[in-house]
Regions:
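Preference for extracellular/luminal or secreted protein segments
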Residues: 1-31, 236, 257-490
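Active-site mouth loops of central-metabolism enzymes
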Residues: 7-19, 83-97, 178-192, 250-255
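Second-shell loop/turn segments in exported
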Residues: 16-17, 37-39, 83-93, 131-139, ...
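Catalytic domains of carbohydrate-active enzymes, especially glycoside hydrolases
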Residues: 24-38, 97-113
């Protein structure tokens, strides 16, 4: 066993504007198995991928968290609808197309391995980190659409990663900040959260192990560090034979444990993602090998799983798409075409209609007009003949409230703050007819004492989805989706 063999177990982060390229070059010399890219311009990402791969003696896997397309992280690339928007449509064709576009643009950037799809279930409105990243709360819908997305990725030469095993949906803690505890019974996990992982076990290129304490599986270690979870359940019971990668080891759920990387490998992980100090982790792995905690055969098996992924990529690696594949007309058209099928009215409420000549007050809680995020929505209403003004309470004017709430790593919160909820309810109470348009989390529509006349969910704030929401309200388009989760207390 060589030091480079141990290094191949490590996949450090490469954060543009922060990571020292010389340090990255030293990591390549050490023999790491790949990098996870964050940020950057298109030119920067492609050049970093090219130069790192050229330095490496073994094939590098370049990964990125492009859940909603590369445009989520890379300026100049296409951002695509959230999983929950696709879930609302129920369309495998849209899921597959999202995967295909993501793969083409990722490969144009030199990224081979997309850390998607999320198959966590949207089973808790207060979950601060899953929410619209999930397809919905139904495991069957999730497995079906995630499978279609994976087929789209693979068809265009990129690898996927099903995450976050054994399911992060039923928690209320962001694992970037602390260790979530999942209190479901084993029967509950098998009936719900584990279903997508079981259904996709043969199809998934890789599975990401989540940093969450699933008490029904292991009361002493989070799933990412648990042999009972990774080997006993995922490998032996679910018959998954592909590569297991940890979630980022610099997340606070496990970062305080200096032995987390070694524990994860001993539990059954094949690649150790984004450690705080990759060189220190390499030294820890070497010590664990020297004292017999890690065996050469286990390392060889993990490396062989990496090599299997590299072989899967080999037909595509010699001919990456050109950079002009980014934001090409066909990819941009996808969002406009998909939007009407993804938008969904709140059930149990009448569909609200605006007409040319109507005066409508627009409102975003605690946000002055100069900072509105819904400018495309407002602009389209005006274009279609509505007179839109900043909402004035107590005038009896019709109200359109735009809510932009989405999961953000390290924020620890989601949906509306108490202050936002108070000002929103006051606006609804003082309005004539009112509609809340959720350009993100649909759960903002639940739990309000003063409820709107209607609710429309777009599940994301992409420009084409804002335009579609305005057209739906003007009866120029039909909202064809169904909210794929239960919105409580309507």
């Amino acid at each position: 066993l060589t030091p480079a063999s141990l290094a191949r177990l490590i996949c450090p982060e490469f954060r543009f504007g922060k990571t020292d390229p010389e340090e990255a070059a030293r990591l390549v010399e050490l023999g790491v198995g790949g990098f996870c890219f964050y940020g950057g311009t298109a030119d920067e990402v492609r050049e970093a991928s090219r130069s790192l791969k050229a330095l490496s003696r073994t094939p590098l896997l370049i990964a990125a968290d492009y859940e909603n397309g590369p445009g989520q992280w890379v300026r100049g690339a296409t951002e695509l609808p959230t999983n929950m928007a696709i879930g609302a449509s129920g369309s495998e064709a849209l899921a597959r197309r999202k995967g295909g576009i993501t793969a083409l643009e990722s490969r144009a950037l030199g990224v081979d391995w997309v850390f998607a799809p999320v198959v966590d279930l949207a089973s808790r409105p207060d979950n601060p980190i899953v929410n619209v990243r999930a397809y919905g709360e139904d495991p069957g819908l999730t497995a079906r659409l995630a499978g279609a997305y994976l087929s789209g990725l693979n068809s265009q030469g990129a690898l996927g990663c099903v995450k976050h095993f054994p399911g992060h949906g039923a928690t209320a803690t962001d694992s970037h900040l602390a260790l979530p505890v999942l209190e479901k019974s084993l029967h509950g996990l098998e009936r719900e959260d584990l279903q997508p992982f079981a259904a996709l076990a043969r199809q998934a290129d890789s599975v990401m192990a989540g940093h969450l304490m699933a008490l029904a599986l292991d009361e002493s270690a989070p799933a990412s560090l648990s042999r009972a979870a990774l080997t006993g359940l995922l490998r032996e019971k679910l018959k998954y034979n592909g590569l297991i990668v940890t979630d980022a080891l610099n997340m606070k759920a496990v970062a305080r444990d200096p032995a987390a990387g070694v524990k994860a490998f001993c539990a059954g992980a094949d690649m150790l993602l984004c450690p705080e100090d990759p060189f220190a982790l390499h030294a820890e792995l070497a010590r664990a090998f020297n004292n017999g905690q890690i065996t050469g055969s286990a390392v060889a098996l993990a490396v062989s799983r990496q090599e299997a992924l590299v072989r899967k990529l080999s037909p595509f690696r010699s001919s990456p798409p050109p950079l002009d594949a980014l934001r090409c007309p066909e990819h941009l058209a996808f969002n406009a075409e998909a939007a009407p099928a993804c938008l969904a009215w709140l059930p149990g409420k009448p569909d609200l209609e605006f007409r040319p000549g109507d005066i409508v007050g627009y409102f975003e809680p605690l946000t002055p007009p100069s900072a509105w995020k819904g400018t495309a929505f407002v602009g389209e209403l005006i274009k279609l003949g509505v007179r839109v003004e900043p909402y004035q309470p107590g005038c009896g004017m019709r109200l359109a409230a735009g809510i932009f709430s989405k999961p953000r790593a390290f924020s620890g919160s989601i949906n509306l703050s108490e202050e936002e909820k108070l000002v929103l309810e006051a606006a609804i109470k003082g309005a004539g007819a009112s509609v809340i348009v959720a350009f993100g989390s649909p759960f903002v529509l639940g739990g309000l004492e003063h409820k709107p006349s209607a609710g429309l969910c777009a599940f994301c704030a992409l420009q084409d989805f804002q335009l579609a929401a305005a057209r739906v309200l003007m009866r120029r388009a039909k909202a064809g989706g169904t909210i794929p989760a239960v919105i409580g207390d309507l």
